[in-house]
Amino acid sequence: MKKLLILLFSLLISFNSYGEWVKVIESDGDHTYYIDIDSLKEENGYVYYWAMADGQKPDEWGDMSTRFYFQGECGLFRLKYLSYIYSKQPMGRGDGEVDNTSSEWIHPTPESIVGVLLSQVCAIY
């Protein structure tokens, strides 16, 4: 697991060909996940960041990509979804449908998609 995190962290640093969105991981399905490095901030013991799931084809609602705004707590390895933006175009382009419904705290497994994203952010802070 440690080797996987080191590999992912090195990818996080080197894959900056998407502008501010940095590719972190691909799922077994048809999604690629990114973190917006420019959005990272730490405040009062929490980390805040935007992440994105970019699909190869539209989902059942016609969305190609979804951006998520997270609040994370590295010490307890937990996070909340603070906002979602659903886009009909790839890489979050175009006008998106915004949902500001905040979730409860989630304790992801380190191997899950959101767990890997949180691990990458926590490695920076």
Predicted stretch roles:
Residues 4-15:
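Sec-dependent N-terminal signal peptides
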Residues 16-67, 73-125:
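N-terminal secretory-pathway/extracellular module detecting exported/lumenal segments
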